Amino acid sequence: MATLFIADLHLSLHEPAITAGFLRFLRHDAIHADALYILGDLFDAWIGDDDPQPLHATIAAELYVLHQRGIPCYFVHGNRDFLIGKRFAKQSGMTLLPTETVLDLYGQKILILHGDTLCTDDHHYQQFRRRVHNPFIQRLFLLLPLSSRVKIAAKMRATSQQENQKKSQQIMDVNHDAVLERLRHYQVKTMIHGHTHRPAIHQVDLGESYGRRAVLGAWHEEGSMIKVTPQNIELISFPF
């Protein structure tokens, strides 16, 4: 009895080893889980459900196998793939979740989210996030020809990489007060997120008690998952 969480795979045609590792994970690990939660940035970029990349169809087909086996798969949007929509969700058998969701797993309440909204010290990114999550702007972008969307996404990615090189590691990490605020808002003691690529399980001082903040690692040289059972929350890394 276990529920699995992953994030920040950044799947792309340029990283076939990561794709192969993810497919093995689905076939050998996720297939035995009670449920799979993907907490954003499954793909390195997403410019619309109408993008005909073969990789998207491959991943959708493999995820749909879980659906056919009766294993639910849930998805929280990341900062790279926030445009994944109902069409791809239906193709893959995934259920799209809100930015923040509280789960009741084995008798414990857990807040899950991608994690970028916790990085409140990065003011420039938060302003950018508000713009690109505007439904009107998203609709306009998705009305553009696919070729135009490809160019815009590439330019935005290049700009983001340049800006991140100038930022301190502290700015790009979560803000402690933001973490406390979300835990208290939802009245939970456990949070699971990705985004920062800094895998760890942190103890959080809530004043009257202690909580946990479990952070998923990115899939670069190895895979990363969090396994929640009735007895434990475990951060696990594994080779592709």
From Swiss-Prot:
TM annotation in the entry: none
What positions does the entry give for Mn(2+) 1 binding?
Answer: D8, H10, D41, H197
Protein's membrane topology: Peripheral membrane protein
In terms of superkingdom, the source organism counts as Bacteria
Locate the coiled-coil region(s) and give their ranges. none
What this protein catalyses is: UDP-2-N,3-O-bis[(3R)-3-hydroxytetradecanoyl]-alpha-D-glucosamine + H2O = 2-N,3-O-bis[(3R)-3-hydroxytetradecanoyl]-alpha-D-glucosaminyl 1-phosphate + UMP + 2 H(+)
Q: List GO BP terms, alphabetically.
A: lipid A biosynthetic process
Which pathway does the UniProt entry assign to this protein?
Glycolipid biosynthesis; lipid IV(A) biosynthesis; lipid IV(A) from (3R)-3-hydroxytetradecanoyl-[acyl-carrier-protein] and UDP-N-acetyl-alpha-D-glucosamine: step 4/6
Sequence positions that bind substrate: N79, R80, D122, S160, N164, K167, H195
| Residues noted as binding Mn(2+) 2 in the record, renumbered to the chain | D41, N79, H114, H195
Question: Which InterPro entries does UniProt cross-reference here?
Answer: Calcineurin-like_PHP_ApaH, LpxH-like, Metallo-depent_PP-like, UDP-diacylglucosamine_Hdrlase
Question: Which subcellular locations apply to this protein?
Answer: Cell inner membrane
**GO-annotated cellular components:** cytoplasm; extrinsic component of plasma membrane
Annotated keywords: Cell inner membrane, Cell membrane, Hydrolase, Lipid A biosynthesis, Lipid biosynthesis, Lipid metabolism, Manganese, Membrane, Metal-binding
GO molecular function annotation: manganese ion binding; UDP-2,3-diacylglucosamine hydrolase activity
Question: What EC number(s) does the entry state?
Answer: 3.6.1.54
* Reported cofactor(s): Mn(2+)
Q: Which family does it belong to?
A: Belongs to the LpxH family.
The UniProt function text for this chain reads: Hydrolyzes the pyrophosphate bond of UDP-2,3-diacylglucosamine to yield 2,3-diacylglucosamine 1-phosphate (lipid X) and UMP by catalyzing the attack of water at the alpha-P atom. Involved in the biosynthesis of lipid A, a phosphorylated glycolipid that anchors the lipopolysaccharide to the outer membrane of the cell.
Record's PANTHER family?
UDP-2,3-DIACYLGLUCOSAMINE HYDROLASE, UDP-2,3-DIACYLGLUCOSAMINE HYDROLASE-RELATED
Mind telling me what this protein is named?
Answer: UDP-2,3-diacylglucosamine hydrolase
Q: Which species does this protein come from?
A: Pectobacterium carotovorum subsp. carotovorum (strain PC1)
